[in-house]
Amino acid sequence: MSEVKVFEVRGTFRMGDEPRQPFTRQVPATSEEEALEKVYSDLGSEHGVSRMEIQIEEIREIDPSKVEDPILRRLLGVEE
């Protein structure tokens, strides 16, 4: 079984006629590809945007101690 890492994904997405909306997501995943799929799925579900409307600018692995979401920190076992 692969080790779970934390990836930070940054980019923008289009919602209708509005200007592009920036986003940053921190997601647990075993690979960059898995993290990317999670972001596509989450943004599509939450905002009703297609993959073609999402532009990824950066994806990078981050240290679990840098995670901002308290729920994700707890799941990763990072001390407060």
Swiss-Prot record:
MF term (GO), any: large ribosomal subunit rRNA binding
Stored Pfam families: Ribosomal_L18A
Keywords annotated in UniProt: Ribonucleoprotein, Ribosomal protein, RNA-binding, rRNA-binding
Keyword Transferase part of the UniProt annotation: no
Gene Ontology CC terms, in alphabetical order: ribonucleoprotein complex; ribosome
Entry annotated with the keyword RNA-binding: yes
Gene3D superfamilies assigned to the protein according to its UniProt record, in alphabetical order: 3.10.20.10
GO biological process, one term: translation
Domain of life: Archaea
HAMAP family named in the record: Ribosomal_eL20
Oligomer and partners: Part of the 50S ribosomal subunit. Binds 23S rRNA.
Family named by the database record: Belongs to the eukaryotic ribosomal protein eL20 family.
This protein's name: Large ribosomal subunit protein eL20
Organism: Methanopyrus kandleri (strain AV19 / DSM 6324 / JCM 9639 / NBRC 100938)
